[in-house]
Amino acid sequence: MNNTRRKLGKLVTASAKKQPLNKAFLTDVMSAIEVLDRKGSRMPSKTYKPSSMVCMRQMYYQVTGEKPDESRTDYASIGMADTGTRRHVAIQEAIASMAELGYDWKYLDVEEYLREKWAQGKCLDVQVRGKRGVETSLYHKTLNISFMCDGIVRYIPSGENLLFEFKNQISFKYSHDDKDRGAVSKSHVDEAHEDQICTYCMALDLDRALVLYENRDNCNLECPEVFEVTPEMKQARVDKILECDSYVERQVPPPMHFDSKPCRWCQYKTACKKHGR
């Protein structure tokens, strides 16, 4: 595979030399973006990821260390992901300043929040692994869950703490409400995000969440609802992890997901095809 990449690199270089100088510059910039992205890639950790819990078979592959499919991400896709990451930072920095500006919202430091919970004998299974900007890397040692928490916000008048999650979407997804097909705008949290939100709330002892959606194309914002997370919803995610654990113990992949929605961006298509339904 390395030899193939070297050959491709030489072909790109040779092609660039035949182009006008401005086009050669453009080609090399795009190539450099892709090379740097590949250098930064690494094997996923053998943990459950709340953002990838729709398909249990994918959960199984992640936690057993199945090698993801080889893929080459083009510069445009890398740029779109980078834009989403930078918007994360900008939005979180604005929220972190709201209390100082006189608004009724306070952005909580997740580690300090957890220290208060630990003192109360709660969230004892959750460890802080570090920070990346304003996001906090967390690990649930009993359920083997790792995740990046966007934050927790406090509504100052009531003192209520709510999970905060930010999603950057293309126009189609941003304007689509999968719980109300006739809606002209998003009025519910996307079903695809419910596992993630419920798992975060379970781990952090929170009962409600605010999910802020941004339209990637024009930067419009929407917070469609206060998402209520019941004890039953939290337990359902725990049960899903425990069920997957049972497959891991037997070294038998779970059945395929009932529909192909999670398959589009799945990194384990080769292994999944090999194991069949």
Model segments located where?
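Metal-dependent nuclease catalytic regions and adjoining charged, substrate-binding loops involved
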Residues: 9, 16, 176, 187-192, ...
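Short, well-structured alpha-helical interface segments that form or flank functional binding sites
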Residues: 86, 146, 192-199
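Short linear motifs at secondary-structure transitions and domain/linker junctions
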Residues: 34-36, 123-129, 184-189, 238-244
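Metal-dependent nuclease catalytic cores that hydrolyze phosphodiester bonds in DNA/RNA
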Residues: 1-163, 170, 175-176
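Residue-level detection of beta-strand scaffold positions
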Residues: 163-164, 201
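Short glycine-enriched, charge-decorated loop/helix-capping segments at active-site entrances
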Residues: 76-77, 179-187
